């Protein structure tokens, strides 16, 4: 698993898509990874990153919500969907910075 990959993670409410944020050198070595949730609910916030099937390989138009960051067990990641391009990850980092405000 690598930073920038989108996976379906097993949650109590069913499988949900997430973007892996944990840095590459440790993502495969630790038990938990930091992820940001994907959602089809667009709020128009600077802390969101819009994704499309054509540009990003996601099944449907959605946003990564950097206001919804959490840690999940690495073993809960079930199925890799796609990997964001370096340019999209650069935008993701800007949205994450906006969300955290630091």
Predicted regions mapped to residue ranges:
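Conserved functional hotspots at enzyme active or ligand-binding sites that engage polyanionic ligands
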Residues: 1-102
């Amino acid at each position: 698993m690598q930073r920038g990959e989108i996976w379906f993670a097993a949650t109590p409410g069913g499988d949900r898509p997430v973007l892996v944020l944990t840095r590459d050198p440790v993502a495969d070595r630790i038990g938990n990874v930091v992820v940001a949730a994907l959602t089809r609910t667009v709020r128009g916030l600077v802390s969101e990153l819009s994704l499309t099937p054509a540009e990003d390989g996601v099944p449907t138009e959605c946003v990564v919500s950097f206001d919804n960051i959490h840690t999940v067990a690495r073993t809960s990641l079930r199925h890799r969907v796609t990997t964001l391009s370096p340019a999209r990850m650069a935008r993701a980092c800007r949205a994450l910075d906006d969300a955290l405000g630091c």
